[in-house]
Regions:
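Terminal presequence/propeptide segments associated with secretion/organelle targeting
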Residues: 1-407
Length: 407
């Protein structure tokens, strides 16, 4: 993030090129921090351990052995211990090399996921070629980020999971990944437009050091993934028994149905939450976001078009102002559970009227994929009146507003 921001701040063109990628990476980073914070703050690991103890005690009271619930907890612990370092490697590999830079994208795809061009009658003459997307990325940023990712991977991942070319970096470049990357970018043709690569002519194909880097990175990933998948099969077999034991132990309690990828409704109430003596309230206002706009010179995320400051500080909200507070309410909280894929889902009141669109969760809801905390987890929705206000005052979409017959 720091590398991207350095180049983005220095050049408007680079900022536009990388804004979406930067925002996505920053959001994922913040999400991970929030999830870990929630796991710690609510003692989730302790809660899960206590719940496991409850299942173990229940199993000990069962009069006869039932193969469907005969969980081998010792084996499961051993499997988790074996799988944990592999999952870490896969995570670090993905964070470092999966679509982080244009170089890594091309290197890891040139020999595996690219369609071959040329006559099928002459396989050695078949080639792959990358489209010209030079307007989407910056060479200097790409090179520095590539070096940083290689260096970080070398530091945090055990040597047994390093690609073979790391030995070249150690022997010929003194372990300096920045010097190696300079050499790599000068000698590889992966980033040059119009270059053809011939995967079926191995000798010719592997003359490009960028191709070698990509192939060795992919080999590391496949080897680790293969081991992890083998363990995952054994883990699933034990977890299936664990799930069945849970269901039988709680036979009299309601259970969620397996409703993934189906259209469904969830129910909740509008309301805030209290944490550490702080009362969150349940909605935000135009006034609060204007205060953030004023701090834009200190916080980049608070920057907005000048028209936004003008519209939201005018106090002229017309029919979009709340009838009780007289303010333009921007977002509100509910005690619904929100997860990936929910963003943009309509939110209706008890009369079936659209009141907002769900789009996020509060900081304290980020561990809800593991455990939903009824006291703290909240769904954030954008108030439909704010949406209409923006359509009207900023977008001048009068016809759309009339068409939907908004009240």
């Amino acid at each position: 993030l720091a590398i991207m921001k350095k180049y983005m701040d220095a050049d408007q063109k680079v900022r536009i090129q990388y804004e979406s990628k930067y925002a996505g990476s920053a959001n994922y980073w913040k999400n991970s921090m929030g999830m870990n914070k929630c796991i710690d703050s609510i003692g989730l690991i302790r809660q899960k351990a206590e719940y496991e103890g409850k299942i173990r005690n229940w199993l000990a009271t069962q009069p006869k052995k039932d193969a469907s619930i005969d969980v081998d907890f010792n084996k499961l612990e051993q499997l988790y211990a074996q799988n944990r370092p592999l999952i870490k490697v896969i995570s670090y590999w993905s964070e470092a090399f999966n679509r982080t830079t244009e170089f890594f994208t091309r290197a890891t795809n040139v020999g595996t996921n690219m369609p071959l061009k040329g006559s099928a009658n002459n396989p050695k003459a078949q080639y792959v070629e990358f489209a010209d997307n030079s307007d989407k990325w910056n060479y200097a940023l790409d090179k520095e980020l590539t070096a940083a990712m290689l260096e970080n991977y070398a530091k945090v991942v055990p040597a047994e999971y390093h690609p073979a070319f790391f030995q070249t970096v150690a022997k010929k470049f003194g372990g300096n990944f920045y010097k190696y990357t300079d050499w790599l970018y000068k000698n590889s043709k992966l980033l040059k437009n119009g270059e053809k690569f011939y995967p079926n002519d191995r000798k010719k194909f592997l003359k490009d050091p960028g191709v070698v880097v990509g192939e060795e990175l992919v080999n590391v990933y496949k080897a680790v993934q293969t081991k992890a998948l083998q363990l995952r099969g054994e883990i699933k077999a034990q977890e299936k028994k664990l799930t069945e034991a849970k269901l039988q132990m709680e036979m009299d309690l309601p259970h969620y149905s397996d409703a993934n990828f189906t259209m469904r409704l969830s129910y909740g109430q509008v309301g805030g939450y209290k944490i550490g003596g702080f009362n969150s309230g349940y909605y935000t206002t135009a006034e609060s976001i204007v205060e953030k706009f004023k701090q834009a010179n200190k916080v980049a995320d608070y920057k907005a078009e000048p028209i936004m400051m003008k519209l939201l500080s005018s106090n002229d909200y017309g029919p979009y102002a709340d009838k009780t507070s007289g303010q333009l309410q921007l977002c509100f909280l509910t005690n619904n559970d929100i997860t990936g894929g929910n963003s943009g889902s309509p939110m209706f009141n008890g009369k079936g009227e659209l009141i907002g669109l769900a789009f996020d969760g509060n900081w304290d809801s980020l561990s809800s994929g593991i455990n939903f905390d009824r006291e703290l987890a909240r769904c954030i929705g954008v108030d439909i009146r704010f949406v209409l206000f923006m359509m009207d005052k900023w977008g001048h979409a009068d016809r759309l507003i009339k068409e939907i017959n908004a009240k």
